Amino acid sequence: SIFLAGPTPRDEKTKSWRTTACERLNKLGFDGIVYVPEYSTWKPKANYIDQAMWEREALIESTVIMFWIPRSLPDMFAFTTNVEFGYWLHSGKVIYGRPDNAAKIKYLDWLYKMDYNKVPINNLEELLKESMILADKLYDEKNTEILPLSKRKILERK
């Protein structure tokens, strides 16, 4: 399963990147579960706690957490995404990408490089393909519990 993490539009005028991601996953033949943390039709949050709990459970259950961060100001701030990225980075199931023109993204790029020795993928379709590969790889090893900080995977810096 893949959780599509990243900014969510805050109004109905802003197009969601997740629609495109789901269409492409379908075309690529992904047959797993895709967790999409937004409503199928735009509407304001009815209950923040219910939404946050649903997302937390889906993040825990997902095999891969794919962060696509097309941050643009003032349309998609992605403040919550920053927290989620930091929280889940060492879970061993994060893959990260963003378009080259994403705003205020240098720190996330730096963390990903330092902790995974990887650069973010700058193309959504490529990120989706790599997410599918990672999901296949991790599926049998999947741990459905949040790892304590002492057991989170931190790659050795070179």
Annotate the PLM regions:
Residues 1-158:
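Conserved catalytic or regulatory cores that recognize and/or transform ribose-phosphate-containing ligands
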